[in-house]
């Protein structure tokens, strides 16, 4: 696939790393094994996609089996994380969560994260083609900034 470079794979690794660190921080506070499994599954999905792009960039081999599980693995991971919050609802100090989310500057980072993820959803639905390197660059830059905003929001909370 033309235009899939090592640089694109490395940029794709930024949101995976930012999201992974953010999930480790949340998992440490939540302490739910279900959340940890969901977070690990979501991060593993991202790592598979980064590996796919790295192999494309270095050896020009399209190992689609590394890319195909991304959406189902990520969705399953997000579902497990959501279920962990429902199951542990009474154990979570929601006042502290709300206070952290609404604190400055965390609130700005969380608003930016939500806005960027919304924009990414729109972009993927209306403009994105998986085989288009330019579209992948755009999506990865949006995602890298967005997931870094999530991480910064959590760090400042």
Residue ranges and their predicted role:
Residues 1-41, 50-157:
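Polytopic alpha-helical membrane-helix bundles and their juxtamembrane interface segments
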